[in-house]
Amino acid sequence: MDADKIVFKVNNQVVSLKPEIIVDQYEYKYPAIKDLKKPCITLGKAPDLNKAYKSALSSMNAVKLDPDDDCSYLAAAMEFFEGTCPEDWTSYGMLIARNRDKITPYSLVEIKRTDVEGNWALTGGMEMTRDPTGSEHTSLVGLLVSLYRLSKISGQNTGNYKTNIADRIEQIFETAPFVKLVEHHTLMTTHKMCANWNTIPNFRVLAGTYDLFFSRIEHLYSAIRVGTVVTAYEDCSGLVSFTGFIKQINLTAREAILYFFHKNFEEEIRRMLEGRQETAVPHSYFIHFRSLGLSGKSPYSSNAVGHLFNLIHFVGCYMGQIRSLNSTVIAACAPHEMSVLGGYLGDEFFGRGTFERRFFRDEKELQEYEAAELTKTDVALADDGTVNSDDEDYFSGEARGPEAVYARIMMNGGRLKRSHIRRYVSVSSNHQARPNSFAEFLNKTYSSDS
């Protein structure tokens, strides 16, 4: 008998077949640089910087930006941001710069130029008669790359969030060492015709390059990161959520994974952890792998590890974390099952801790404590008297740990307890739920059961 087949009748005729469904055909690509070549983009002919500045500023005021021209200008303007490398900087086997080297963002990528001239039109109606200063160049660069951050803010229910961000960015780039170039609300108005610029490959690479540079190099103009910081760990929300989760519950990655009682975690954990990437290397290309074009379909995104992502944020919801309540549920990754496991794990770690004495008056007291521990004599609670028997589970080692949690789930038939449901409803009902968020899911799923 073939375990993959089902048998049924059609018009009294027995049919045996193997059900086939649509599966994910995308190949997850790890962002390793194997040929020791820096990320590369191709742009038009290098412009005259002063002419390019006047054209880019004019087009911003006229809300008629040309992405090819602006990318060409952003690449050429990298020369204004020279800094000193504080130590040898390597990534994926490549030497980016040596200690004390003078470098610019241009040092991080390879930019090829063609002979194609840019448009460099003066669409704003007013032509500058003088050449721009260095501060004016850096201010315009800051405004242009900020279009990346604004274009990453999506959704209909953001309220005034995007407008407030745009206004704050404008304030930064009209304050020293920058200078005011545009009128109030110009950035938000301009963004509306550039709402999809985060999908333009060259613009994305340039934004990531500027962010990688300023995250490493102390610089007068480092505030430019206000517009590019979203390129760091882009399409990496699954791995970022997992990292935050293990810090939140104060466990190692190995200890945390022991609590993941579901078969669908197996492939996701393998995918997320086996890539042998520079996840722990400071200032690596890995941090900006998506914006620098080093990976097509990220193995670290929320969709790539959807069950893991759902579980982590259901635990976060149980603990009342706003970020988790606002996050978007991955609907195709068993959210109902993950909410059950999330309730048990939330209950396991919420309002409890593992404590021990770590500081002592002198070495003699330390030695006495260690000797007592060796003989299994608990002196850690000596100053607190006895433990109430009603709270015994909170202090009993046998009641904590993955085995204990798994046993509780099995004893309850894989269903949430009433106390778990009440907690979920409590945190979600007091929160203004965004569409498709975890808060909305919990409200719709459990509010009638509380």
UniProtKB/Swiss-Prot annotation:
Phosphorylated by host CK2. Unphosphorylated protein N seems to have a better affinity for leader viral promoter encapsidation. Phosphorylation of protein N in ribonucleocapsid may stabilize the interaction with protein P, thereby playing an important role in viral transcription/replication. It is found in: Virion; Host cytoplasm. The modification Phosphoserine is found at S389. The keyword RNA-binding applies. It comes from the Viruses. GO terms for molecular function: RNA binding. SUPFAM superfamilies: Rhabdovirus nucleoprotein-like. One of its GO terms (cellular component) is viral nucleocapsid. It holds the Pfam family Rhabdo_ncap. InterPro entries: Rhabdo_ncapsid, Rhabdovirus_ncapsid_C, Rhabdovirus_ncapsid_N, Rhabdovirus_nucleoprotein-like. Keywords: Capsid protein, Helical capsid protein, Host cytoplasm, Phosphoprotein, Ribonucleoprotein, RNA-binding, Superantigen, Viral nucleoprotein, Virion. Homomultimerizes to form the nucleocapsid. Binds to viral genomic RNA. In nucleocapsid, binds protein P and thereby positions the polymerase on the template. Protein P acts as a chaperone on free protein N to prevent it from aggregation before encapsidating genomic RNA. Displays a superantigen activity in human and mouse, activating mostly V-beta-8 subtypes of T-cell receptor. Belongs to the lyssavirus nucleocapsid protein family. Encapsidates the genome in a ratio of one protein N per nine ribonucleotides, protecting it from nucleases. If expressed without protein P it binds non-specifically RNA and therefore can bind it's own mRNA. Interaction with protein P abolishes any non-specific RNA binding, and prevents phosphorylation. The soluble N-P complex encapsidates specifically the genomic RNA, with protein N protecting the genome like a pearl necklace. The encapsidated genomic RNA is termed the nucleocapsid (NC) and serves as template for viral transcription and replication. This is Nucleoprotein. It comes from Rabies virus (strain China/DRV) (RABV). The lineage of its organism: Viruses, Riboviria, Orthornavirae, Negarnaviricota, Haploviricotina. The gene is N.
